[in-house]
């Protein structure tokens, strides 16, 4: 049974500690994926590495740097002059937040990067990121904007509502 009442809020100290743990976890994922990719593609199979091997590594590093820096900027705490914590930063573990999407991008890139040691075709899976971004853009912004009624529509809706009410009254009289 679900607990009744409001969900408890986190304190700024707890948010700060969880943010530090989250950043540490994702930095380990980034370092691990890069280590595996470099060990396999650039050390073990150095003779068969090409421009695309280096390009994909640079692409992954750029994605990692952008995502990780954004997350660390969001989680940056504010301290008072005496060293006490004023603000723990934005909660990186908050559901439906921007940090959730950044974490997904890091995980997708790490998975694709490690799988690409088996075949370069796994890089096509990275197309899931822009597809997800377009889906979110459509669902949250473009779809509602295109399906919104125009300014002239409320007048027509009032006329149609009046006609509908008249027809309902007539039907009620008949029965």
Swiss-Prot record:
Keywords for this protein: Autophagy, Endoplasmic reticulum, Membrane, Transmembrane, Transmembrane helix
Subcellular location, record wording: Endoplasmic reticulum membrane
Sequence ranges of Basic residues compositional bias: 162-175
TM stretches of this protein: 25-45, 51-68, 105-126
Region listing for Disordered, in residue ranges: 152-175
Keyword Lipid metabolism in annotation: no
Coiled coil ranges: none
Membrane topology, from the record: Multi-pass membrane protein
InterPro entries: SND2/TMEM208
GO cellular component terms, A-Z: endoplasmic reticulum membrane; intracellular membrane-bounded organelle; vacuole
Role description: May function as a negative regulator of endoplasmic reticulum-stress induced autophagy.
Entry similarity comment: Belongs to the TMEM208 family.
UniProt-recorded name of the protein: Transmembrane protein 208
Organism for this UniProt entry: Danio rerio
